[in-house]
From Swiss-Prot:
Bias type Polar residues, positions: 1-10
Active site positions: D149
Keyword vocabulary terms for this entry: Methyltransferase, S-adenosyl-L-methionine, Transferase, tRNA processing
Annotated source species: Pseudomonas paraeruginosa (strain DSM 24068 / PA7) (Pseudomonas aeruginosa (strain PA7))
Protein name: tRNA (guanine-N(7)-)-methyltransferase
The encoding gene: trmB
Phylogenetic classification of the source organism: Bacteria, Pseudomonadati, Pseudomonadota, Gammaproteobacteria, Pseudomonadales
Keyword S-adenosyl-L-methionine attached: yes
């Protein structure tokens, strides 16, 4: 999740062209950024405590967190403000956050140290690779995707993270009854998300009208979102529950 309109999205999607070898299409852009003193402190002191490395093996998150608890996986937490707010408000839940932007990773880690929170673990890599290799099937209670890069231009739509392959990967990782919660401030992308998820097998749209849900109270409001509301911009939330 991010306080910017286009936070680096967080994963990769494979597309196949019969005339060419398979290649990887990234849905995120690695953006350089200077580290503040606090962000560097987070990386230096927080990463050894809360950071996780990509592995080829399924991870035992009960052992990593030292308990059994409902588990949320967040793709693209931006600067980590909303992650910190959610984790502080729900100490009985565990959060796994993934972000490729190093200043954002450092900011979240510094926040965890400052607030004394222990229910968050952090990856700094491709979120889809974490899902594929590190997360057991049917193990997540929620997956959060807040304000991913909408890739406005039509020729870039293939870079959007929400695609049929993504929907199926997430379905496998969610428990039955688990929920994929997405939010975007770009209406065409909201419609794209709705189309993809409505066609994906094994899900139920939790919206009463079969479209979008009211903003859930558990999703923190970002600075960017508040600014957008003052300007009359909309935000669309989608919740799809795994039913099969």
């Amino acid at each position: 999740m991010s306080d910017t309109p286009q936070s680096p999205a967080q994963d990769s999607l494979a597309e196949h062209d019969e005339a060419r070898p398979m290649r990887t299409v990234k849905s995120f852009v690695m953006r350089a950024g200077r580290m503040t003193e606090g962000q560097q402190r987070g990386l230096d002191l927080g990463w050894p405590k809360f950071g996780l490395e990509l592995s080829d093996e399924v991870q035992d998150f009960d052992a990593i967190f030292g308990r059994q608890a409902p588990r949320t996986f967040e793709i693209g937490f931006g600067m980590g403000h909303s992650t910190l707010e959610m984790a502080a408000a729900a100490p009985d839940l565990d959060f796994i956050g993934v972000e490729v932007h190093k200043p954002g990773v450092g900011a979240l880690l510094n926040g965890l140290l400052t607030q004394g929170l222990g229910n968050v673990r952090v990856y700094s890599c491709d979120a889809l690779e974490v899902l594929r290799h590190c997360v057991a099937d049917a193990s997540l209670d929620r997956l959060l995707l807040f304000f991913p890069d909408p890739w406005h231009k039509k020729r870039h739509h293939k870079r959007r993270i929400v695609q049929p392959e993504f929907a199926e990967l997430v379905r496998r990782k969610l428990k039955v009854g688990g929920v994929l919660h997405m939010a975007t401030d770009w209406e065409p992308y909201a419609e794209h998300m709705l189309d993809v998820m409505s066609a994906a097998p094994g899900y139920r749209n939790q919206a009463e009208d079969g479209r979008f849900v009211p903003r859930p109270q558990e999703r923190p409001v970002t600075k960017f979102e508040r600014r957008g509301e003052r300007l009359g911009h909309g935000v669309w939330d989608l919740k799809f529950e795994r039913v099969d």
